[in-house]
Structures are given as structure tokens and as C-alpha cells.
Design a protein with these regions (language model features):
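Extracytoplasmic/periplasmic solute-binding protein
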Residues: 1-25, 65
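C-terminal capping/gating helix-and-loop segments adjacent to ligand/active sites or protein-protein/ligand interfaces
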Residues: 110, 173-197
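Flexible glycine/proline-enriched surface loops and loop-helix/loop-strand junctions
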Residues: 16-26, 61, 111-116, 186
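Extracytoplasmic/periplasmic substrate-recognition and gating elements
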Residues: 41, 45-46, 84-152
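Short helices/loops that flank or line small-molecule/ion binding pockets
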Residues: 45, 54-68
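Paired acidic/hydrophobic, glycine-rich loop segments that form the ligand-binding mouth/hinge
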Residues: 66-71, 77-78
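Glycine-centered hinge/linker elements that transmit conformational signals in sensory
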Residues: 22-53
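Stable alpha-helical elements in mature extracytoplasmic
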Residues: 3, 7, 33-40, 56, ...
């Protein structure tokens, strides 16, 4: 779904406007969206893009592809070695970069992640759920949580605090690169929630 969301963001960065029909399907009459889709389709047909039921990090770790597009939390699933199909291995030299963007346009980024909800319940349970959310998003606790999981911080000050964070898991440098990339995106990209139908 990350490549498809990138197609959508590319179309929006080019000024497509709404590209969904009232039934939630893509509007194939939207010229800007169609061109973004065809750019992706041509790259796919030429073998420049791999679409698979595997996560992109799996294909990076087996040496099948040189790069992948995925969520920030995918950092949890990278090994420190690349293991090729023939069993040979070499050290992983992971580099984490900001999400690709359209040249000359305002950068957009997908905003997705863990959703917390509380079902209609008793007042006491609702208060307990609210207390848990406040506890989890308290600045220092949230900083520790996101630094261990690859999630984007929910507190603005956490981006500044994470620059000097010293408890990242291994590979430490990859986590530092991840949060440097996320900080760039937080400062210069506009987040968009995924569409709801």
C-alpha cells in the first residue's frame, strides 16, 4: 500500500484535487491522477518497481532490491546482515531517508499509524482509557516508546529531545538516521491522513 499511497500523494502534489468517485473508486477521468498512476505503471512494467505481498524490508534483506518504501516502524524488522539466496552474507549498510516528494511542489506525507479508541462503555472505563492515553503520550515516556518502536513522536518537543537521545536499540545509527529523516518531514512536509470511505 505504500507505493499506491505515494502515487496518490504525487497526484495531490501536482494539484489533482479529489481523485475519488462518490463510491470511493479512483476517478479515471482525473487527468492529473491518471498521469501519476501511469508514471507508476510504466515504472512497474519496466521492472523499476517491485510490488509484492512481502514487506519491502524482506526483499532488501535478501538482496532482491536495493531500496524499499515503508513505514518508520519497519526499522524494527531490519537485520544487520543481507543474506542472499545462495546463503552468502554481507553487513547491512542501512540508510534511512525522508519520503520521496515531487520536485517543485509542496511535500506531502502519509500520516497513518496506531489508532487508539475506547468503545462506548462506563464512565469509569472511559476515564481509565483517557488516563492511559495521557500516560502513554507524556513527553518522556512517549520519547522512550517511539525511540524503541520507530514511531513518529506525538509531542512537538520530542523531535528536539530525540536528537540527543542515547538509548536507541541497535543499529543505533539507523535509528538516528530515521529520526533525522522524520524531523525533516515534520518540519517541511504536510501530513495527510489516509482517506476514509
Amino acid at each position: 500500500d505504500y507505493p499506491i499511497r505515494s502515487v496518490e500523494l504525487n497526484a495531490l502534489e501536482h494539484g489533482s484535487g479529489d481523485f475519488y468517485t462518490k463510491n470511493g473508486w479512483y476517478d479515471t477521468n482525473n487527468v492529473v491522477f491518471k498521469e501519476s498512476w501511469m508514471q507508476f505503471a510504466r515504472s512497474l512494467a519496466q521492472g523499476h518497481v517491485v510490488v509484492s505481498d512481502l514487506y519491502s524490508n524482506t526483499q532488501v534483506m535478501t538482496g532482491d532490491v536495493l531500496s524499499g518504501l515503508g513505514s518508520s516502524a519497519a526499522i524494527l524488522y531490519y537485520n544487520d546482515t543481507v543474506t542472499y539466496r545462495d546463503g552468502t552474507q554481507e553487513p547491512m549498510d542501512l540508510h534511512v531517508l525522508p519520503m520521496p516528494k515531487t520536485a517543485g511542489a509542496d511535500a506531502l506525507m502519509a500520516q497513518a499509524g496506531v489508532g487508539l479508541c475506547a468503545y462506548k462503555t462506563t464512565d469509569q472505563k472511559a476515564e481509565a482509557a483517557a488516563l492511559f492515553v495521557r500516560w502513554l503520550t507524556e513527553s518522556e515516556r512517549n520519547l522512550d516508546f517511539v525511540a524503541q518502536t520507530g514511531y513518529m513522536p506525538v509531542r512537538n518537543g520530542a523531535f528536539d529531545a530525540i536528537e540527543n537521545y542515547d538509548k536507541f536499540p541497535e543499529p543505533t545509527e539507523s535509528y538516528r538516521q530515521l529520526y533525522a529523516a522524520l524531523k525533516i518531514m515534520q518540519e517541511s512536509y504536510t501530513p495527510l491522513s489516509e482517506p476514509r470511505f
